[in-house]
UniProtKB/Swiss-Prot annotation:
Originating gene: mqo
GO biological process: tricarboxylic acid cycle
Family indicated by similarity: Belongs to the MQO family.
GO molecular function: 2-hydroxyglutarate dehydrogenase activity; L-malate dehydrogenase (quinone) activity
Pathway: Carbohydrate metabolism; tricarboxylic acid cycle; oxaloacetate from (S)-malate (quinone route): step 1/1
Keywords in alphabetical order: FAD, Flavoprotein, Oxidoreductase, Tricarboxylic acid cycle
Organism taxonomic ancestry: Bacteria, Pseudomonadati, Pseudomonadota, Gammaproteobacteria, Enterobacterales
Enzyme Commission number, as recorded: 1.1.5.4
Entries under InterPro entries matching the protein: FAD/NAD-bd_sf, MQO
Catalytic activity line of the entry: (S)-malate + a quinone = a quinol + oxaloacetate
Protein name in UniProt: Probable malate:quinone oxidoreductase
Entry cofactors: FAD
C-alpha cells in the first residue's frame, strides 16, 4: 500500500512539473502589459477581429484600472475640444487655429462609436454606468481673454463638429448655465463663456472593468493580476520572451513567449520599452507630472452644478494643468472636482517607485532630457509655483471659479501620474511633448504607448492607429476591413465637413449611449 501511495505521489509531482514546464515555455499570440483602458481596448478589438488568437494580459496590481484609468485618478472628461482652449491656439496674426481641435473631436467620435458597438453586443453594460451627458463650457474673464474666446467660438463655427455650441457675455445667461460660477462674482467683471450640450463625463475605470470582464469569458484570454513584467527580450525566431514575476508568490518569475507584445503600462511603459532594445526606443525620455484635485461630495453643492467648466492654462504649463470645475459621476454619486494642481515626484505610476525617473535615464535620452530642462523655463517656473502652494492657495484658485465656496466642504485628492514624452530632436536636442505616441518595432512585433493627454478619451482611435501600424497586412484584408467598419461605421471617413455623416453617426451613438443629441445645421453667414 505504501508503494502505491508513493507511486501516486510521484506521478502527481511529475504531472505538476510537466504542467509548470509547459506554462513556462508557452507561446501566445498576444501579450498585453498593463490592465488599463488601452490594453482593454486593444484586447477587445483583437478578440473581435481574431477570436481564435490567444491573449495574455499582465497587471501588477490586484485589479484592473487601478492606476490612471481609475475614475478617481483622472478628470473623466470626454475630450472633444469643446471646452479645452489649449487645443485652439491663437496664431501670430491673431486668428485661431482649430486644426488640433478638429482632430481631437474626430478622435472622440471614434471612441463613441467603439463604445456603442460594445453596448449593442453586451460587452459594455448600462451606458449610464460609464458615460453621461455633461455640458462642456469655456469660461474666461478680462478683455483679452474675452476677445480670444469670442474669436475661438467664431472660428469653431466653420467646422461641422462644433455647431450647436452657444456663446454669451451676459452674466444672467451664464448664471443659468453654471450658477455656482456666477454666484458672488463681481458684477463689473467682464466675462464670457461658451457651452456645448454634447459634452460628456466618462468613467474610464468602469469601461476598463467591463471590457476585461467580457474578455475573461473567452477561453483564449487569460488575465494575470498581481503579475509584474520584469523583462522583455527578442527570441531568435523574432517572437518575444516576456519575464513575469508573480507578486503573490514572492516574485517567482516565469516566462511567456509572444508573437506580439503591447506595452500599455501607463507611466511604466518607457522603462519596459527600453528593455526591448529596439532602436526605435532610443532617445525617448519621460517627465512625470502628478495631479491633485479639490473634491466635494456634498450633494447640496454638487446638485447645483452640471457642467465641466474649463478656464485658461498658465503660459508654458502642460495641458493637464488647465483649471476646470467638473461635474463627475463616481461610485454612483454626483460629485464636484476642481483642479488640477501639479505635483512632482520621481514616480512614473501612482503606486510606483520614487526611483522610476532615475531608472529611466540612459545614454540615449540624457542629453534630450537636459535640453528640455534648459529650454522649458516656463514649465519649470509653473511647477515650482504649484509645489509651493498650500491649502489656502489652492482654495483661492477654486474661488476664482466658485466665488462662494467654503473650504470645509472640500478635501484634497491625489490623482494619477501623467508621464510626458521627451524626444530626441536634431535641432533643439530634446523636445517635450504633451500628447500620446505609439512607438513600435520596424517589424510590428512590439509596440508601446507613451504620453498622457488626451489619453483615455482617445483609446479607441489610438489603438486603431496602432493596429494599422503593426498589423498593416491584416487591416488591409476584406475580413478586417468589414469588421472594423461594423465596429466603427465612419471608419475611413472624416466627419468634419460632412453634415449628413456627422448627424448619422452622432444620432446613432447618442441613441445607443443615451446621450444628448443636437442636429448639425449648415453654416450660416
Amino acid at each position: 500500500m505504501r508503494k502505491i501511495l508513493v507511486l501516486i505521489f510521484c506521478l502527481n509531482l511529475f504531472g505538476v512539473t510537466q504542467q509548470a514546464a509547459a506554462e513556462e515555455n508557452k507561446t501566445v499570440d498576444v501579450v498585453l502589459i498593463g490592465g488599463g483602458i488601452m490594453s482593454a481596448t486593444l484586447g477587445t478589438y483583437l478578440h473581435e477581429l481574431e477570436p481564435n488568437w490567444s491573449i495574455d494580459m499582465y497587471e501588477r496590481m490586484n485589479g484592473v484600472a487601478e492606476e490612471s484609468s481609475n475614475g478617481w485618478n483622472n478628470a473623466g472628461t470626454g475630450h472633444s475640444a469643446f471646452a479645452e482652449m489649449n487645443y485652439t491656439p491663437e496664431k501670430k496674426d491673431g486668428s485661431i487655429d482649430i486644426s488640433k481641435a478638429v482632430v481631437v473631436n474626430e478622435s472622440f467620435e471614434i471612441s463613441r462609436q467603439f463604445w456603442s458597438y460594445q453596448v449593442k453586443n453586451n460587452v459594455l453594460k448600462d451606458p449610464k454606468s460609464f458615460i453621461n451627458s455633461v455640458p462642456h463650457m469655456s469660461f474666461v474673464w478680462g478683455d483679452d481673454n474675452v476677445n480670444f474666446l469670442r474669436k475661438r467660438y467664431a472660428a469653431l463655427q466653420h467646422s461641422t463638429l462644433f455647431r450647436g455650441m452657444e456663446y454669451s457675455e451676459d452674466a444672467n445667461q451664464i448664471k443659468q448655465w453654471a450658477p455656482l460660477v456666477m454666484d458672488g462674482r463681481d458684477p463689473k467683471q467682464k466675462i464670457a463663456a461658451t457651452r456645448m450640450p454634447l459634452g460628456t463625463d466618462v468613467n474610464f475605470g468602469v469601461i476598463t472593468h467591463q471590457l476585461v470582464d467580457t474578455l475573461t469569458k473567452n477561453p483564449n484570454f487569460k488575465l494575470n493580476l498581481s503579475h509584474e513584467v520584469r523583462d522583455i527580450k527578442r527570441n531568435d525566431d523574432n517572437t518575444w520572451r516576456v519575464t513575469v514575476a508573480d507578486l503573490t508568490r514572492d516574485g517567482k518569475e516565469t516566462t511567456v513567449n509572444a508573437k506580439f507584445v503591447f506595452i500599455g503600462a501607463g507611466g511604466a511603459s518607457l522603462t519596459l520599452l527600453q528593455k526591448t532594445g529596439i532602436p526605435e526606443a532610443e532617445g525617448y525620455g519621460a517627465f512625470p507630472v502628478g495631479g491633485q484635485f479639490l473634491v466635494t461630495t456634498n450633494p447640496e453643492i454638487a446638485n447645483q452644478h452640471l457642467a465641466k467648466v474649463y478656464g485658461l492654462a498658465s503660459v508654458g504649463s502642460p495641458p493637464m494643468s488647465v483649471p476646470h470645475l467638473d461635474t463627475r459621476m463616481l461610485d454612483g454619486k454626483r460629485v464636484l472636482l476642481f483642479g488640477p494642481f501639479a505635483t512632482f515626484s520621481g514616480k512614473f505610476l501612482k503606486n510606483g517607485s520614487l526611483f522610476d525617473l532615475l531608472h529611466s535615464l540612459s545614454t540615449s535620452n540624457l542629453m534630450p532630457m537636459t535640453h528640455v530642462g534648459l529650454d522649458n523655463f516656463d514649465l519649470v517656473k509653473y511647477l515650482v509655483g504649484q509645489l509651493m502652494m498650500n491649502d489656502d492657495d489652492r482654495f483661492a484658485a477654486l474661488k476664482e471659479y466658485f466665488p462662494e465656496a467654503k473650504q470645509a466642504d472640500w478635501k484634497l485628492w491625489t490623482a494619477g501620474q501623467r508621464v510626458q514624452i521627451i524626444k530626441k530632436d536634431d535641432e533643439k536636442g530634446g523636445l517635450l511633448q504633451f500628447g500620446t505616441e505609439v512607438v513600435s518595432a520596424k517589424d510590428g512585433s512590439i509596440a508601446a504607448l507613451l504620453g498622457a493627454s488626451p489619453g483615455a478619451s482617445t483609446a479607441a482611435p489610438i489603438m486603431l492607429h496602432l493596429m494599422e501600424t503593426v498589423f498593416k497586412d491584416k487591416v488591409a484584408t476584406p475580413e478586417w476591413q468589414s469588421k472594423l467598419k461594423e465596429i466603427i461605421p465612419s471608419y475611413g471617413h472624416k466627419l468634419n465637413g460632412d453634415i449628413e455623416m456627422t448627424n448619422k453617426i452622432r444620432g446613432y451613438t447618442s441613441s445607443v449611449l443615451q446621450l444628448d443629441y443636437i442636429e448639425v445645421k449648415p453654416e450660416t453667414n
